[in-house]
Amino acid sequence: MIDGKTIAITRSKDDAEEFIELISKHNATPITLPTIELVSKGEKIVDEFLETIEKESPDFSVFMSSKAVTLLIDSAKSISKFEDLQLAIANTTVIAVGPKTKDALERENIKVAHMPQRYSSVGVGEVFTKLNAVGKTTII
């Protein structure tokens, strides 16, 4: 089906490897064109996250990327606010977009309550539908 075609992979270099292998295996030519780069906001992101949780008391915390989890956790650790972050997240129902994100959270002893079958924002929406989350608040 993709034999002989050229396929653009818009993931970061780290995330592109599995797609490069898969595309090459099917006799297509992969081209890596990373379109998104996550850049840490430093301690600001941790403070904003904690302030939002304190002010809004969200029912759910949704994590859409293992890299974003790592940036948030590493930033919290660097400013000695990791335990505050863990506690704040623990007071919400945690949803991870996929297995890599779930693993990143669980490595830090953050319990993931839900993970969609489809690893995308659509899948997260389906989780909310199943949970009948109408009127609930969420931090993403």
Where are the regions that the model predicts?
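Conserved beta-alpha
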Residues: 1-140
